[in-house]
Amino acid sequence: CQSRREVNPGDDGVAISRVVETAASWDGAPLPSYPRGAPRVTILRATVPPHTALAMHTHALVNAGVILRGELTVIAETGAQRMFRAGEGIVELVGTRHYGENRGDGELELVMFYAGTQGMSLSERADL
């Protein structure tokens, strides 16, 4: 049996990097306060095929993620858009209609983290 060596962040062999820290979504809008109620954290891993757009939708809760592979372009109803590449963090729009699109030739893979309360929907479809 191998013995376990305990280390602290920053010790030899442990690398930590801040992907994103902000109080605003990717378009610069301030994030809302967290809702009151029993907390619920959800983490989703998504894979999006090449040349695929997700449906227009909104979020009522703060959510953020990391692009693991590929590129994600997010387009807001205002026309503002931004591309996120592998390794980059994204802080989503809250209360603004938007959609994501994989415009690349390879799969897009990302992990999203949602911070809400029991009973809150992660997103709502928002057709034009």
Q: Which residues does each PLM region occupy?
A:
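Extracytoplasmic
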Residues: 38-43, 49, 95, 105-108
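Glycine- and acidic-residue-biased ligand/ion/polar-headgroup-sensing regions
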Residues: 59-78, 88
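Short acidic-glycine-tyrosine-enriched beta hairpin
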Residues: 48-49, 77-95
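N-terminal post-signal-peptidase region of extra-cytosolic proteins
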Residues: 46-52, 60, 69, 96-99
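A short, N-terminal "cap"/entry segment at the start of jelly-roll beta-barrel domains
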Residues: 1-42, 83, 125-128
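A short beta-loop-beta micro-motif enriched in histidine and acidic residues
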Residues: 36-39, 51-66
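Ligand-binding loop in jelly-roll beta-barrel domains
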Residues: 94-120
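Short histidine-centered beta-strand/loop micro-motifs
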Residues: 33, 53-59, 76, 83, ...
